[in-house]
Design a protein with these regions (language model features):
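Small-molecule pocket liners
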Residues: 51, 153, 170-171, 179-182
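Contiguous, glycine/small-aliphatic-enriched amphipathic segments in soluble metabolic enzymes
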Residues: 2-4, 12-154, 196-285, 289-312, ...
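Ligand-binding beta-strand-loop-alpha-helix segment within the catalytic cores
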Residues: 174-203
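Short, flexible loop segments at boundaries between secondary-structure elements
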Residues: 158-171, 175-179, 309-323
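A broad structural signal for alpha-helix termini and local helix breaks/kinks
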Residues: 67-68, 160-164, 188, 217
Protein backbone atom coordinates (compact mmCIF):
# COMPACT_ATOMS: atom_id res chain seq x y z
CA UNK A 1 0.00 0.00 0.00
CA UNK A 2 1.30 3.45 -0.88
CA UNK A 3 1.92 5.35 2.34
CA UNK A 4 -0.49 8.24 2.80
CA UNK A 5 -0.19 11.62 4.45
CA UNK A 6 1.66 13.40 1.65
CA UNK A 7 2.42 16.91 2.90
CA UNK A 8 5.36 19.04 1.89
CA UNK A 9 7.52 20.64 4.57
CA UNK A 10 6.01 23.89 5.81
CA UNK A 11 8.84 25.92 4.30
CA UNK A 12 7.79 24.80 0.82
CA UNK A 13 4.61 26.86 1.03
CA UNK A 14 6.32 30.21 1.49
CA UNK A 15 6.17 33.03 -1.04
CA UNK A 16 8.34 32.36 -4.06
CA UNK A 17 9.57 28.98 -2.80
CA UNK A 18 7.69 26.79 -5.26
CA UNK A 19 5.89 27.21 -8.53
CA UNK A 20 2.16 27.41 -8.02
CA UNK A 21 -0.34 24.76 -8.98
CA UNK A 22 -2.67 25.58 -11.88
CA UNK A 23 -6.29 24.89 -10.91
CA UNK A 24 -8.83 24.75 -13.72
CA UNK A 25 -12.30 26.26 -13.62
CA UNK A 26 -14.12 23.02 -14.39
CA UNK A 27 -17.83 23.26 -15.16
CA UNK A 28 -18.74 26.80 -14.06
CA UNK A 29 -22.30 25.83 -13.10
CA UNK A 30 -21.01 23.01 -10.90
CA UNK A 31 -19.27 23.04 -7.54
CA UNK A 32 -15.75 23.69 -8.86
CA UNK A 33 -15.85 27.47 -8.29
CA UNK A 34 -17.40 26.93 -4.84
CA UNK A 35 -14.58 24.58 -3.86
CA UNK A 36 -11.81 26.84 -5.15
CA UNK A 37 -13.15 29.77 -3.15
CA UNK A 38 -13.74 27.69 -0.04
CA UNK A 39 -10.30 26.08 0.08
CA UNK A 40 -8.55 29.42 -0.46
CA UNK A 41 -10.41 30.77 2.58
CA UNK A 42 -8.85 27.93 4.61
CA UNK A 43 -5.36 28.17 3.07
CA UNK A 44 -3.64 29.05 6.34
CA UNK A 45 -5.52 26.57 8.48
CA UNK A 46 -4.84 23.78 5.96
CA UNK A 47 -1.30 24.94 5.07
CA UNK A 48 -2.12 24.57 1.38
CA UNK A 49 0.42 24.85 -1.42
CA UNK A 50 -0.02 28.02 -3.50
CA UNK A 51 -2.32 27.76 -6.50
CA UNK A 52 -4.03 29.98 -9.01
CA UNK A 53 -7.29 29.34 -10.82
CA UNK A 54 -7.72 29.88 -14.56
CA UNK A 55 -11.13 31.54 -14.70
CA UNK A 56 -13.24 34.63 -15.33
CA UNK A 57 -12.54 36.85 -12.28
CA UNK A 58 -15.94 38.54 -12.47
CA UNK A 59 -17.70 35.19 -12.42
CA UNK A 60 -15.72 34.12 -9.36
CA UNK A 61 -16.54 37.40 -7.64
CA UNK A 62 -20.25 36.86 -8.26
CA UNK A 63 -20.05 33.30 -6.94
CA UNK A 64 -18.18 34.43 -3.83
CA UNK A 65 -20.89 36.99 -3.17
CA UNK A 66 -23.59 34.36 -3.59
CA UNK A 67 -21.79 32.12 -1.08
CA UNK A 68 -21.23 34.96 1.37
CA UNK A 69 -17.46 34.57 1.19
CA UNK A 70 -15.05 37.47 1.49
CA UNK A 71 -12.47 36.46 -1.09
CA UNK A 72 -10.20 39.16 -2.52
CA UNK A 73 -9.34 38.28 -6.12
CA UNK A 74 -6.37 39.46 -8.16
CA UNK A 75 -5.73 38.95 -11.86
CA UNK A 76 -2.14 37.73 -12.09
CA UNK A 77 0.36 35.97 -14.28
CA UNK A 78 1.46 32.50 -13.10
CA UNK A 79 4.81 33.89 -11.95
CA UNK A 80 3.05 36.31 -9.58
CA UNK A 81 0.64 33.75 -8.14
CA UNK A 82 2.74 32.19 -5.38
CA UNK A 83 3.82 35.49 -3.77
CA UNK A 84 0.22 36.75 -3.90
CA UNK A 85 -1.42 33.58 -2.59
CA UNK A 86 -1.35 34.47 1.10
CA UNK A 87 -3.31 37.69 0.65
CA UNK A 88 -5.49 37.15 -2.45
CA UNK A 89 -6.86 34.34 -4.57
CA UNK A 90 -4.72 34.56 -7.71
CA UNK A 91 -6.72 34.33 -10.95
CA UNK A 92 -5.14 33.89 -14.36
CA UNK A 93 -7.96 35.49 -16.32
CA UNK A 94 -9.78 33.92 -19.23
CA UNK A 95 -10.81 36.12 -22.12
CA UNK A 96 -14.14 34.27 -22.21
CA UNK A 97 -16.85 35.63 -19.91
CA UNK A 98 -18.97 33.08 -18.05
CA UNK A 99 -22.68 33.61 -17.43
CA UNK A 100 -23.88 30.14 -16.35
CA UNK A 101 -26.04 30.07 -13.23
CA UNK A 102 -25.02 27.64 -10.46
CA UNK A 103 -26.82 24.35 -10.82
CA UNK A 104 -27.96 24.95 -14.40
CA UNK A 105 -25.99 23.16 -17.10
CA UNK A 106 -25.35 25.64 -19.90
CA UNK A 107 -23.48 24.75 -23.09
CA UNK A 108 -22.36 28.37 -23.38
CA UNK A 109 -19.89 27.71 -20.54
CA UNK A 110 -18.11 24.89 -22.42
CA UNK A 111 -15.61 27.16 -24.24
CA UNK A 112 -14.42 28.61 -20.93
CA UNK A 113 -14.11 25.17 -19.33
CA UNK A 114 -12.00 23.90 -22.24
CA UNK A 115 -9.93 27.08 -22.47
CA UNK A 116 -9.13 26.80 -18.77
CA UNK A 117 -7.74 23.30 -19.27
CA UNK A 118 -5.72 24.40 -22.30
CA UNK A 119 -4.18 27.32 -20.42
CA UNK A 120 -3.32 25.25 -17.35
CA UNK A 121 -1.64 22.57 -19.46
CA UNK A 122 0.24 25.20 -21.45
CA UNK A 123 1.48 26.78 -18.22
CA UNK A 124 2.72 23.53 -16.71
CA UNK A 125 4.43 22.45 -19.93
CA UNK A 126 6.13 25.85 -20.12
CA UNK A 127 7.38 25.46 -16.55
CA UNK A 128 5.23 28.29 -15.17
CA UNK A 129 3.16 25.94 -13.00
CA UNK A 130 4.24 22.94 -10.97
CA UNK A 131 1.24 20.75 -11.77
CA UNK A 132 -2.33 20.82 -13.04
CA UNK A 133 -5.32 20.21 -10.76
CA UNK A 134 -8.59 19.94 -12.65
CA UNK A 135 -12.02 20.73 -11.29
CA UNK A 136 -14.80 18.43 -12.55
CA UNK A 137 -16.40 19.05 -15.94
CA UNK A 138 -19.83 18.07 -17.24
CA UNK A 139 -19.17 15.75 -20.16
CA UNK A 140 -22.69 16.06 -21.51
CA UNK A 141 -22.32 19.85 -21.69
CA UNK A 142 -18.99 19.51 -23.50
CA UNK A 143 -20.34 16.89 -25.90
CA UNK A 144 -23.30 19.07 -26.88
CA UNK A 145 -20.85 21.88 -27.57
CA UNK A 146 -18.77 19.62 -29.85
CA UNK A 147 -16.04 18.29 -27.54
CA UNK A 148 -14.64 15.18 -29.24
CA UNK A 149 -12.64 13.48 -26.48
CA UNK A 150 -14.14 10.89 -24.10
CA UNK A 151 -13.02 12.85 -21.06
CA UNK A 152 -10.42 14.94 -19.26
CA UNK A 153 -7.72 12.28 -19.41
CA UNK A 154 -7.84 11.79 -23.17
CA UNK A 155 -8.00 15.55 -23.76
CA UNK A 156 -4.82 16.04 -21.74
CA UNK A 157 -3.05 13.48 -23.93
CA UNK A 158 -4.31 15.31 -27.02
CA UNK A 159 -2.89 18.60 -25.73
CA UNK A 160 0.49 16.96 -25.11
CA UNK A 161 0.42 15.55 -28.65
CA UNK A 162 -0.38 18.99 -30.08
CA UNK A 163 2.53 20.51 -28.16
CA UNK A 164 5.16 17.80 -28.64
CA UNK A 165 4.05 15.49 -31.43
CA UNK A 166 4.29 12.55 -29.04
CA UNK A 167 1.45 10.05 -28.75
CA UNK A 168 0.80 9.03 -25.16
CA UNK A 169 -1.47 6.56 -23.43
CA UNK A 170 -2.64 8.24 -20.24
CA UNK A 171 -3.67 5.96 -17.38
CA UNK A 172 -6.21 6.84 -14.71
CA UNK A 173 -5.32 5.96 -11.13
CA UNK A 174 -7.59 6.63 -8.18
CA UNK A 175 -5.42 7.16 -5.11
CA UNK A 176 -6.12 7.36 -1.40
CA UNK A 177 -4.02 6.51 1.67
CA UNK A 178 -6.09 3.33 1.98
CA UNK A 179 -5.98 2.10 -1.62
CA UNK A 180 -4.76 2.91 -5.13
CA UNK A 181 -6.61 1.40 -8.09
CA UNK A 182 -6.20 1.54 -11.86
CA UNK A 183 -8.98 0.48 -14.25
CA UNK A 184 -7.41 -1.08 -17.35
CA UNK A 185 -10.57 -0.36 -19.34
CA UNK A 186 -12.51 2.70 -18.31
CA UNK A 187 -15.83 4.04 -19.62
CA UNK A 188 -17.18 1.05 -21.52
CA UNK A 189 -20.42 -0.89 -21.37
CA UNK A 190 -19.77 -4.25 -19.71
CA UNK A 191 -20.47 -6.11 -22.95
CA UNK A 192 -17.64 -4.18 -24.68
CA UNK A 193 -14.98 -5.07 -22.13
CA UNK A 194 -14.41 -8.49 -23.67
CA UNK A 195 -13.66 -6.85 -27.04
CA UNK A 196 -11.26 -4.27 -25.60
CA UNK A 197 -9.34 -6.20 -22.97
CA UNK A 198 -6.06 -7.76 -24.12
CA UNK A 199 -2.80 -8.96 -22.64
CA UNK A 200 -1.04 -6.11 -24.44
CA UNK A 201 -3.32 -3.52 -22.83
CA UNK A 202 -2.76 -4.95 -19.36
CA UNK A 203 1.01 -5.04 -19.85
CA UNK A 204 1.15 -1.49 -21.19
CA UNK A 205 -0.96 -0.25 -18.29
CA UNK A 206 1.17 -2.12 -15.76
CA UNK A 207 4.39 -0.68 -17.16
CA UNK A 208 3.08 2.89 -16.98
CA UNK A 209 1.82 2.39 -13.43
CA UNK A 210 5.08 0.84 -12.24
CA UNK A 211 7.14 3.59 -13.87
CA UNK A 212 5.17 6.44 -12.31
CA UNK A 213 5.05 4.77 -8.90
CA UNK A 214 8.85 4.78 -9.07
CA UNK A 215 9.40 8.24 -10.49
CA UNK A 216 6.64 10.19 -8.78
CA UNK A 217 5.64 8.23 -5.69
CA UNK A 218 9.21 7.28 -4.83
CA UNK A 219 8.67 3.52 -4.62
CA UNK A 220 11.83 1.62 -5.46
CA UNK A 221 9.99 -1.64 -6.15
CA UNK A 222 6.28 -1.09 -6.81
CA UNK A 223 4.03 -4.08 -6.16
CA UNK A 224 1.08 -4.56 -8.49
CA UNK A 225 -1.93 -6.75 -7.79
CA UNK A 226 -3.74 -7.79 -10.97
CA UNK A 227 -7.43 -8.58 -10.62
CA UNK A 228 -9.06 -11.35 -12.56
CA UNK A 229 -11.92 -10.53 -14.90
CA UNK A 230 -14.32 -13.31 -13.96
CA UNK A 231 -15.62 -14.41 -10.55
CA UNK A 232 -12.84 -16.14 -8.58
CA UNK A 233 -10.44 -15.29 -11.44
CA UNK A 234 -12.19 -17.82 -13.63
CA UNK A 235 -11.90 -20.89 -11.36
CA UNK A 236 -9.28 -22.50 -13.62
CA UNK A 237 -11.41 -21.89 -16.69
CA UNK A 238 -14.72 -23.15 -15.33
CA UNK A 239 -16.07 -19.57 -15.07
CA UNK A 240 -14.67 -18.20 -18.30
CA UNK A 241 -11.32 -18.55 -20.03
CA UNK A 242 -10.30 -14.87 -20.15
CA UNK A 243 -8.21 -15.01 -16.98
CA UNK A 244 -6.12 -17.91 -18.28
CA UNK A 245 -5.94 -16.64 -21.86
CA UNK A 246 -5.53 -12.88 -21.30
CA UNK A 247 -4.76 -11.88 -17.72
CA UNK A 248 -2.31 -14.62 -16.69
CA UNK A 249 -0.07 -14.15 -19.77
CA UNK A 250 0.01 -10.41 -19.07
CA UNK A 251 1.15 -11.02 -15.50
CA UNK A 252 3.86 -13.35 -16.80
CA UNK A 253 5.08 -10.67 -19.22
CA UNK A 254 5.20 -8.05 -16.48
CA UNK A 255 7.22 -10.39 -14.28
CA UNK A 256 9.58 -11.09 -17.18
CA UNK A 257 10.14 -7.34 -17.49
CA UNK A 258 11.16 -7.11 -13.84
CA UNK A 259 7.87 -5.72 -12.51
CA UNK A 260 6.53 -7.18 -9.26
CA UNK A 261 3.07 -8.31 -10.35
CA UNK A 262 0.73 -10.93 -8.90
CA UNK A 263 -2.42 -12.35 -10.41
CA UNK A 264 -4.92 -12.93 -11.69
CA UNK A 265 -6.41 -12.54 -8.22
CA UNK A 266 -10.00 -13.05 -7.21
CA UNK A 267 -11.39 -9.52 -7.00
CA UNK A 268 -13.74 -10.36 -4.14
CA UNK A 269 -10.82 -10.90 -1.74
CA UNK A 270 -8.33 -8.24 -2.93
CA UNK A 271 -9.52 -5.21 -1.06
CA UNK A 272 -9.72 -6.07 2.63
CA UNK A 273 -7.14 -4.47 4.90
CA UNK A 274 -4.71 -7.38 5.12
CA UNK A 275 -4.74 -7.91 1.36
CA UNK A 276 -4.18 -4.21 0.65
CA UNK A 277 -1.00 -4.25 2.71
CA UNK A 278 0.57 -6.65 0.20
CA UNK A 279 0.52 -4.33 -2.83
CA UNK A 280 0.90 -0.68 -3.82
CA UNK A 281 -1.67 -0.50 -6.61
CA UNK A 282 -4.40 -2.78 -7.92
CA UNK A 283 -4.95 -3.12 -11.65
CA UNK A 284 -8.62 -3.86 -12.26
CA UNK A 285 -10.12 -5.05 -15.51
CA UNK A 286 -13.05 -2.63 -15.69
CA UNK A 287 -14.38 0.60 -14.24
CA UNK A 288 -16.62 -0.55 -11.40
CA UNK A 289 -14.23 -3.28 -10.28
CA UNK A 290 -11.78 -0.46 -9.47
CA UNK A 291 -14.04 2.36 -8.36
CA UNK A 292 -16.45 0.53 -6.06
CA UNK A 293 -13.77 -0.45 -3.51
CA UNK A 294 -12.00 2.91 -3.44
CA UNK A 295 -15.23 4.88 -3.20
CA UNK A 296 -16.33 2.59 -0.39
CA UNK A 297 -13.08 3.13 1.51
CA UNK A 298 -12.31 6.76 0.61
CA UNK A 299 -15.38 8.40 -0.86
CA UNK A 300 -14.58 11.93 0.31
CA UNK A 301 -10.81 12.02 -0.04
CA UNK A 302 -9.81 9.87 -3.03
CA UNK A 303 -7.87 11.65 -5.78
CA UNK A 304 -7.83 11.02 -9.52
CA UNK A 305 -4.22 10.97 -10.78
CA UNK A 306 -3.33 10.75 -14.46
CA UNK A 307 -0.23 8.64 -15.03
CA UNK A 308 1.80 8.57 -18.23
CA UNK A 309 1.87 12.34 -18.82
CA UNK A 310 4.99 14.55 -18.86
CA UNK A 311 3.51 16.55 -15.98
CA UNK A 312 1.54 15.95 -12.81
CA UNK A 313 -2.25 16.09 -13.04
CA UNK A 314 -4.64 15.38 -10.20
CA UNK A 315 -8.36 15.93 -9.76
CA UNK A 316 -10.93 15.49 -7.03
CA UNK A 317 -12.72 12.18 -7.38
CA UNK A 318 -16.24 13.54 -7.73
CA UNK A 319 -18.45 15.19 -10.30
CA UNK A 320 -20.02 18.58 -10.81
CA UNK A 321 -22.80 18.12 -8.20
CA UNK A 322 -25.17 20.56 -9.89
CA UNK A 323 -27.75 19.96 -7.17
CA UNK A 324 -25.65 21.71 -4.51
CA UNK A 325 -23.70 24.21 -6.65
CA UNK A 326 -23.86 27.71 -5.24
CA UNK A 327 -25.24 26.56 -1.89
CA UNK A 328 -22.02 26.34 0.13
CA UNK A 329 -22.69 22.68 0.96
CA UNK A 330 -19.98 21.17 -1.27
CA UNK A 331 -17.35 19.18 0.64
CA UNK A 332 -13.82 20.37 -0.29
CA UNK A 333 -12.02 17.33 1.16
CA UNK A 334 -11.22 15.70 -2.19
CA UNK A 335 -9.98 18.96 -3.76
CA UNK A 336 -7.77 19.57 -0.72
CA UNK A 337 -6.34 16.07 -1.15
CA UNK A 338 -5.84 16.68 -4.88
CA UNK A 339 -3.94 19.92 -4.26
CA UNK A 340 -1.71 18.35 -1.62
CA UNK A 341 -0.98 15.27 -3.70
CA UNK A 342 -0.20 17.37 -6.78
CA UNK A 343 2.29 19.43 -4.78
CA UNK A 344 3.93 16.34 -3.35
CA UNK A 345 4.23 14.59 -6.72
CA UNK A 346 5.48 17.71 -8.47
CA UNK A 347 8.13 18.21 -5.80
CA UNK A 348 9.28 14.61 -6.20
CA UNK A 349 9.46 14.63 -9.99
CA UNK A 350 8.25 17.70 -11.86
CA UNK A 351 8.83 16.41 -15.40
CA UNK A 352 8.74 12.70 -16.17
CA UNK A 353 10.58 11.72 -19.37
CA UNK A 354 8.24 10.25 -21.96
CA UNK A 355 8.72 6.59 -22.73
CA UNK A 356 10.15 5.90 -26.15
CA UNK A 357 7.45 5.04 -28.64
Amino acid sequence: MIEGGFRLPRSCYGSGIVRPLALTLGEPAGIGPDLALAVWCRRGELDLPPFYIVADPEYLARRAGRLGLNVPLAAVTPSAAAPAFRSVLPVVPLELPVTAEPGRADRSSAPAAVASIRRAVGDVMAGAAAAVVTNPVAKNVLYHWGFAEPGHTEFLAKLVHEATGKMLRPVMMLWSPELAVVPVTIHLPLREIFNQLSSELIVETGRIVARDLCLRFGLAHPRLAIAGLNPHAGEEGTLGDEDRAIVAPAVAQLLAQGIDARGPLSADSMFHERARASYDAALCMYHDQALIPIKTLAFDHAVNVTLGLPFVRTSPDHGTAFDIAGTGRADPTSLIAALRLAARLAAAEHAVPLAAS
